[in-house]
Amino acid sequence: MADSSFDVVSKVDRQEVDNALHQAEKELNTRYDFRGTGAKIEWSGEDKIVLTAEAEERVKAALEVFKEKLIRRDISLKAFDAGEPVASGKTYKITGTLVQGIDAEHAKKISKKIRDEGPKGVKAQIQGDELRVSSKKRDDLQAVIALLKSEDFGIALQFVNYR
């Protein structure tokens, strides 16, 4: 019998993030406490989001609105890395980045966790920005998924291609 396997990835559905951004933008335009503050949220390039407002507390509040919308769209906050408010002229700006892919450091941590605490006979291989986990028994793979879900690696993990 062939080995069963699945991939551990860290990807974000950009369309869902775009929907969350538009919902947050709509709320910023209609909420009374954001009137006249110049609060805006917009894309900057492929994976950066910029929030601007005329006061530091308003830009932080706009960030909270955006995070709330991300949660509602089932996007992990670990996938969005927001910076600190930066004063630029009369406005304050927060630049956030969408974090995608598992870097080598996190992949090694995850692989070590599987080797140390996972069931015997489970193999983890690093393949670029994802991790392939394989085993002869599907039950062992389920145990590995449960193990990885219980641990916090600081990035959003998804489990795909379960065969």
Curated annotation (Swiss-Prot):
- The answer, when asked if Nucleotide-binding is one of the entry's keywords, is yes
An example Gene Ontology molecular-function term: nucleotide binding
**UniProt keyword annotations, A-Z:** Nucleotide-binding
Cite the InterPro entries for this sequence.
DUF520, UPF0234-like_C, UPF0234_N, YajQ-like_sf
The yes or no answer to whether the keyword Nucleotide-binding is present is: yes
For this record, the Gene Ontology CC terms, alphabetical, are: cytosol
User: What job does this protein perform?
Assistant: Nucleotide-binding protein.
By sequence similarity, the record places it as follows: Belongs to the YajQ family.
NCBIfam families (UniProt xref):
PRK05412.1 (NF003819)
Its name, as the record gives it, is: Nucleotide-binding protein NFA_51200
Protein's organism: Nocardia farcinica (strain IFM 10152)
Source species taxonomy? Bacteria, Bacillati, Actinomycetota, Actinomycetes, Mycobacteriales
